């Protein structure tokens, strides 16, 4: 009977490319795809991912991939985050917040997008946004039917709200220079 073949680690041409090239490539990819594709290949890639991948868009990510990324990457270094409770990702926002209470784990976020949030959960989630003192861009998508309370975000420069006509609007205070985009949808 033949012995099972053992795989030897042989260096590939890809592994001889400089780190700077990989950092540039990672910049063109969503952090979710980068971490999912390059994690645990070798120590070099793992270090590059941990040091340079900071932007994560979970808008259309499966639950399995979502859990893999959140368990295998250091979220306290994230710079940008997009969460969605859309048709493909129901309950994602609540699941993320249960795993990682916002004020404790991702207070360093600079760009935050929360999309398709249910009104019931928005009442719990939105007051926590004030803990993001470094937030420069905030997008809140498709919230409808409730009062959005006043929040203070001193670093905020860009605010995008997508809502319906049944939402009482947020009170915006203390903004020097800010781009505000408001989208209304009717249903």
Q: How would you label these PLM feature ranges?
A:
Residues 1-187:
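The conserved beta-strand core of Leucine-Rich Repeat
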């Amino acid at each position: 009977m033949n012995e099972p073949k053992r795989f030897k680690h042989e260096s590939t041409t890809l592994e001889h490319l400089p780190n700077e090239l990989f950092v540039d490539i990672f910049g063109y990819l969503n952090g979710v795809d980068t971490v999912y594709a390059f994690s645990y290949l070798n120590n070099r890639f793992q270090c590059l991912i941990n040091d340079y991948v900071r932007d994560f868009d979970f808008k259309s990510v499966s639950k399995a991939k979502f859990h893999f990324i959140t368990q295998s990457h250091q979220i306290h270094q994230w710079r940008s985050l997009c969460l969605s409770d859309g048709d493909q990702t129901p309950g994602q926002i609540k699941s993320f917040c249960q795993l990682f209470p916002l004020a404790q784990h991702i207070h360093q976020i600079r760009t935050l997008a929360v999309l398709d949030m249910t009104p019931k959960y928005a009442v719990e989630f939105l007051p926590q946004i004030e803990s993001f003192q470094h937030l420069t861009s905030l997008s809140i998508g498709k919230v409808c039917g409730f009062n959005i309370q006043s929040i203070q975000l001193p670093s905020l420069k860009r605010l995008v709200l997508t809502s319906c006509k049944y939402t009482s609007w947020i009170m915006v205070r203390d903004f020097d220079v800010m781009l505000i985009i408001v989208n209304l949808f009717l249903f």
